[in-house]
Design a protein with these regions (language model features):
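Extreme N-terminal leader/targeting segments of oxidoreductases
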Residues: 1-7, 25-26, 229, 477-491, ...
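Helix-rich C-terminal "cap"/substrate-channel and partner-interaction subdomain
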Residues: 123-156, 381-479
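Active-site/ligand-binding neighborhood in enzyme catalytic cores
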Residues: 129-255, 462-477
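N-terminal glycine-rich phosphate/pyrophosphate-binding loop and immediately adjacent elements
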Residues: 3-146
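A conserved FAD-binding loop/helix module that cradles the flavin
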Residues: 501-522
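A conserved beta-strand/loop element that lines the FAD pocket in flavoprotein oxidoreductases
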Residues: 251-265
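A glycine-rich dinucleotide-binding beta-alpha-beta segment and adjacent secondary-structure elements
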Residues: 192, 196-212, 357, 375-388, ...
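Mid-domain catalytic core of redox enzymes
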Residues: 231, 237, 264-396
């Protein structure tokens, strides 16, 4: 006989665990099912090289929402943020730019390249932060459906519009961010390519876009919306990114949450238009009237459900939902940290740059995208080297270090050859760039883990290895994420919900889709009990 729960969560990533923890706190008997042998999804810490613990996929803490941290009491369960330094951007010719929370410090760095750009930076920061403040409010909203004409939907849309009535002319600032390229947006403020590249760099992180791609300006804002104090809101987590998901899981377990690993879901069961449970690949069944899927919308709707039972327009929308990925991750165990020629501790004001961007100009970033656009890996990739072991002594042996390299572009599909035969070429391209700024770094490598988009897809199930479960473009955001009419975390199957990064507000280790989905689940449950 199938074991019964009040709610089942498919996928033990941070959003699934967050949703499950909130439901457990509300008194629901809740089960989380994870395909892998370890909980965490893209927020995991694993010992791939003996003695070295890698944050295998996600690598920096920024977007985890303060409400999730507080409600789930994560600090009680081992969650501790360690500071990242100001962002250090080495440039050719042994120069550099510093991008810091301290506006005056950033201005001083900019002023060595352009007095005009330095002078206008505080105005730009205030202008961008106005939009960020609006987006931070939108994070916790359930997107209404403005196209629906029933009274309930009309009231929800009217309530939403009234709530944000004071946005006024700032609406046009948001439209600019949603539609303009990063280069065009930044060129309205800055003149030097090196300075524009400091911010435009974010527009390519995790997305198949370059700084000249329409809509790429929004991705800058997505990455700076975090409310954690630090360089642009960035920090490390003691014990690696897996410490976040372990803390969420433990918080849930204290309230009765059940988490099971090595449980691959094969199908979501339904009867009479209502969710009734799940079936695993080994035939095991679990029953529940509430099922929340933390996996990609493509898997939820196109693999776990019978498409014939879904509205044809939803199937078409999900089939065309863009998930093509060009992100790679290389985790390195090494004898020593990269020693950047352009870094001077006295001049920079900190001991070592734990957070670095290699992508010196707009043109460099666009060339990296151009290679991928035509089906090849970037010959000169942009790279984010982060060095958590400089501040975290729990992840590497004494005197040794962990360096995480995230970057782009490495297309899921290559025009010539495949990743099985060309992965070493990617490594060479990446290390050539690192060694160009930090000579001799590659000589001290002890071991590494190389993840291309197909590797990421195989390990955590995100289609095409997309780290956000789908592109962050205007047609795939808010009331269109993952599809029009189904952005409120619900689905055409009553009792089946979406709680992962395919839902609003998208990817990043933030916990917001899980939080929002749990709120809607509990709201529906309360409504049903009154009927």
């Amino acid at each position: 006989m199938a074991e019964r729960f009040d709610a089942i969560i498919i996928g033990g990533g941070h959003n699934g665990l967050t949703c499950g923890a909130y439901l457990a706190r509300a008194g629901l008997k809740t089960l989380v099912l994870e395909r892998r042998e370890v909980l965490g999804g893209a927020a995991v810490t694993e010992e791939v090289v003996p003695g070295f613990k890698f944050s295998v996929f996600s690598y920096l803490m920024s977007l985890l929402h303060p409400r999730v941290i507080a409600d789930l009491e994560l600090t009680k369960y081992g969650y501790k943020v360690l500071p990242a330094t100001d962002m250090f951007a080495p440039l050719p010719g042994d120069d550099h730019i510093i991008f810091a929370d301290d506006i005056a410090k950033t201005q001083a760095s900019f002023s060595r390249f352009s007095a005009k750009d330095a002078a206008i930076y505080p105005q730009f920061d205030a202008y961008l932060m106005d939009s960020v403040k609006i987006m931070r409010r939108l994070l916790l909203e359930t997107p209404p459906d403005p196209s629906c004409r029933d009274w309930k939907s009309f009231k929800e849309t009217a309530k939403f519009l009234w709530k944000y009535r004071r946005v006024n002319n700032k609406l046009f600032r948001l439209i600019d961010l949603m539609t303009m390229s990063a280069d065009d947006y930044l060129s309205e403020w800055f003149e030097r390519s090196e300075i524009k590249a400091v911010l435009a760099y974010y527009s390519g992180i995790g997305t198949f876009a370059g700084p000249k791609s329409p809509g790429s300006a929004y991705v800058i804002m997505h990455h700076v919306m975090g409310e954690h104090a630090g360089a642009g809101g960035w920090g490390f987590v003691r014990g690696g990114m897996g410490a976040i998901t372990q803390a969420i899981a433990q918080s849930g377990r204290e309230k009765g949450l059940v988490c099971k690993t090595d449980c691959e879901v094969a199908a979501i069961e339904s009867s009479g238009g209502r969710a009734s449970g799940v079936t695993l690949s080994d035939g095991t069944r679990y029953e529940a009237d509430i099922v929340a899927s933390n996996v990609s919308a493509k898997l939820t709707f196109l693999k776990f459900l019978d498409k014939a039972k879904l509205p044809p327009e939803l199937v078409r929308d999900i089939e065309s939902y863009r998930t093509f990925s060009t992100a790679f991750k290389i985790n390195i165990a090494c004898e020593r940290l990269p020693q950047y020629r352009a870094f001077d501790a006295a001049k920079c004001g900190f001991a070592y740059p734990t957070y670095t961007h290699i992508g010196p100009t707009i043109e460099y970033l666009e060339r990296a995208y151009d290679d991928a656009k035509y089906g090849d890996m970037s010959r000169e990739p942009f790279i984010t080297p982060v060095t958590p072991s400089f501040v975290d002594d729990t992840i590497s042996p004494p005197g040794k270090h962990v360096v995480n390299l995230f970057g782009g572009h490495a297309p899921y599909h290559l025009r010539e050859g495949d990743w099985a035969t060309r992965k070493d070429e990617l490594v060479r391209n990446v290390l050539k760039q690192i060694d160009g700024y930090a000579p001799g770094f590659s000589d001290g490598i002890i071991g590494m883990q190389v993840l291309t988009p197909p590797d990421i897809e195989a390990k955590i199930g995100s289609p095409h290895g997309h780290i956000f479960h789908g592109e962050l473009q205007i047609d795939q955001l808010f009331w269109a994420r993952p599809a029009p009419h189904w952005a409120d975390y619900r689905t055409p199957i009553s009792g089946l919900y979406q709680c992962g990064s395919s839902a609003h507000p998208g990817g990043g280790v933030g916990g917001v889709p899980g939080y929002n989905a749990a709120r809607e689940i509990l709201k529906d449950r309360k409504r049903r009990r009154k009927m």
